[in-house]
Structures are given as C-alpha cells and as structure tokens.
Regions:
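Structural scaffold elements adjacent to functional motifs in cytosolic proteins
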Residues: 60-62
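Metallo-beta-lactamase
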Residues: 103-104
Length: 146
C-alpha cells in the first residue's frame, strides 16, 4: 500500500487531465449525495410506498394530467394538476404533520412538488421514484376513473 502512495504523485503528474477529471467527478458525486441527504424529502420505491400506505395512511397526491389520472392511478390518490398545485393552500394546512406522498407518470415533476411541500413546512414528504410507471412495473394495483 505504501508503494502505491509513494508513486501517486508521479501518476498524477503524468496523467494530469485524467486526475483532474477524476477529482471533478468525485466532487460532483459527493455534492449530489449531500444534496440528496439534506433536501427534506425521501424517495420511495413502490414497495416502500406500499408499506407507508399500510402503516401511516399518507395523503397520496397524483400530479398527472386528468386524462392520465382517469386511465390509471394508485388507489386512494387525489389528482392535482401541477399548475394548480399550491402547498400554501388552506386545505393542505391541516395535513402538514401528516405524511404526504407525491407521484406523477414518470417521477420527474413530482420531485419538484415534493421540494415545494418541504419549502412550505411539511414535515414528512415522500416522492415515488419512477412514478406510476415504477408502480405498474412492480405489478401493484391501479384504479381507473375518478
């Protein structure tokens, strides 16, 4: 091991571009992990969301378009369009202490909504990674209609 440490400065000197790229990627990975840890909401898998639903009865918010919601959604979810999603709404104020899980079709726009909920003071915010597509891929039940 000490042989490697003694030759490390020589390697870095001979491969400066490679070493700088490695350091940049390492810093980016560490920064990404720190931001993930401190963002205030947790990403859930479909199995973890199922456990949350069974144990704590969270408020499920589906951010899909109304037509997509009618085609398929997680049973018990409420449909709210992202353009109409307002965490400061007086109807949501009573559930600030209750768990809230958000999802959309693919899981991209719901992450933005989760961040808005945390900013508004919600304590337990969850986001379904992969969205409804991941839920369906896990062969979990979906409801149709309103």
């Amino acid at each position: 091991m000490s042989e490697i440490l003694h030759r490390l400065p020589e390697f870095i000197g001979n491969h400066l571009v490679l070493s700088v790229l490695f350091a940049g990627v390492l810093v980016a990975l560490i920064g990404n992990e720190f931001s993930r840890l401190f963002r205030g909401y947790r990403e859930l898998t479909p199995a973890a969301l199922t456990q949350l639903i069974n144990r704590e009865s969270p408020l499920l918010v589906d951010l899909s378009a109304a037509a997509d919601f009618e085609k398929a959604h997680i049973p018990g979810a409420r449909n709210v369009q992202l353009s109409q999603f307002d965490p400061e709404n007086k109807d949501l104020a009573p559930v600030k202490e209750r768990p809230v899980a958000v999802y959309c079709r693919a899981g991209t726009t719901s992450a933005q909504a989760a961040a808005r909920l945390v900013k508004a003071g919600f304590k337990q915010v969850f986001w379904l990674g992969g969205g409804l597509a991941a839920w369906r891929e896990a062969n979990l039940p979906v409801a149709k209609g309103r």
